[in-house]
C-alpha cells in the first residue's frame, strides 16, 4: 500500500509543481503587460473637454464609431437640442434685466417644447418638434438671451447644433451622425470613462472621471500607478460660473483644482500634460469683444512673451487673443514654478478638443514625453 501511496503522492507533487510553474509564468506575463501599459489619467473641472479627448483617441487610434454607435448617439444629440432651447428660454426671465419673446405668437411653440411630452425619454422627435425649435430659436428675444449665455449654463455646442443646416440634417429620418456631431454631443459624465489603444506598438490606457465637484471624491481611486496626468482646462470659461453655484468663476475653479493636483502628496512624482483647451471658443469670445480684464484684473498688466513665433499661432489671431491664451497658460505655470521640486514637470499645450487634426498633432508631440515618463517610472531610463 505504501508503495502505491508514494506513487500517487509523487504524481500530486509533480502536478502541483507544474501548476505553480504555470502560475509563475502567467504572473510574469501579466507583470510584463502591466509594466508595458502607459496609463494616462484625465483630470479637470466639469465641461473642460475630457470626454471629448477620449472620443478623439477612439477616432484616431481605434476604428472610430460604428454605424450602430452613431445611430445610438442620435438620441443624445436630439436631447441636446431640446435641452438647449429649454435652457435658453427658461433663462430669459431670470436674467437681469429679463428678456421677453420677440414674437408673442411663439409662446405656443415654447409651451410645447416645455411640455412633459417632449421631455419623455422615449420621445421620437417628430417634424413638429423641429418646426417648433426653428420658430423659437429664431425669435429675436431668444437670440438676445442666447448671446448672454455666460450668465447661465449653456453647452458649448449650442451654436453648432442649432444652425439651420444641422437642423435640416438631423430631422432627416435616416441621418447618421458624423464625427463632429459625436464630438460635440454633451452627456454629463458620471463615474469613470476610458479607452485603450495602441500607437506604434505602444499600449495606452486613457481614463478619466467626471469633473463636477460631486465626482471628485472618486479621483483618489485613480491615482495609483499612473504614467502621467493630462489636465484639461477650458480657457474659454473665463467669463462663466460653475454649474454647482452662481458665483465661482469656472477658470479660477480650474486653477484651484490644478494647484491641488500639483501639490497632492500622492502625485509629487507624476508629471502633468496641460491641455489649455477650447482655444476656438476663446478666440470667438475675444473677437466678439469679451474682455478678460473684467474677470481677471491682472490681465491689464500682463505682457505676453516677446519671442512668439506667429507662424505657429492660429491664422487671424489678434494681439488680444494671443495675450489671453498666454496669460492663461502662464497662470498655470506660475503654480508649478511656485512649488517646483524637480520631481515632476508640467508640459502645456494649446488644444481644441473637437479638432481631430489638432489633437493628433498634440498627442503625437506628447508621446515621447509620455514614454520617457514611463521608462523613468520603472527605472528603465
From Swiss-Prot:
Please list the residues that bind GTP: 44-51, 183-189, 208-212, 277-280, 353
The G-alpha domain covers which part of the protein? 36-381
Molecular function GO terms recorded: G protein-coupled receptor binding; G-protein beta/gamma-subunit complex binding; GTP binding; GTPase activity; metal ion binding
Q: Which GO terms describe its cellular component?
A: cytoplasm; heterotrimeric G-protein complex
Region of interest: G2 motif: 181-189
Q: Where is this region: G1 motif?
A: 39-52
User: Matching SUPFAM superfamilies, A to Z?
Assistant: P-loop containing nucleoside triphosphate hydrolases, Transducin (alpha subunit), insertion domain
Residue numbers binding Mg(2+): 51, 189
The segment annotated G4 motif runs over 273-280
In terms of Gene3D superfamilies, this protein maps to: GI Alpha 1, domain 2-like, P-loop containing nucleotide triphosphate hydrolases
List, alphabetically, the InterPro entries matched: Gprotein_alpha_S, Gprotein_alpha_su, GproteinA_insert, P-loop_NTPase
Q: Which UniProt keywords apply?
A: GTP-binding, Lipoprotein, Magnesium, Metal-binding, Nucleotide-binding, Palmitate, Transducer
Q: What does this protein do?
A: Guanine nucleotide-binding proteins (G proteins) are involved as modulators or transducers in various transmembrane signaling systems. The G(s) protein is involved in hormonal regulation of adenylate cyclase: it activates the cyclase in response to beta-adrenergic stimuli.
User: Could you say which protein family the record assigns here?
Assistant: Belongs to the G-alpha family. G(s) subfamily.
Q: Give the matching PANTHER family.
A: G PROTEIN ALPHA S SUBUNIT (PTHR10218:SF212), GTP-BINDING PROTEIN ALPHA SUBUNIT (PTHR10218)
Q: How does it assemble?
A: G proteins are composed of 3 units; alpha, beta and gamma. The alpha chain contains the guanine nucleotide binding site.
Protein name as annotated? Guanine nucleotide-binding protein G(s) subunit alpha
Native species: Geodia cydonium (Sponge)
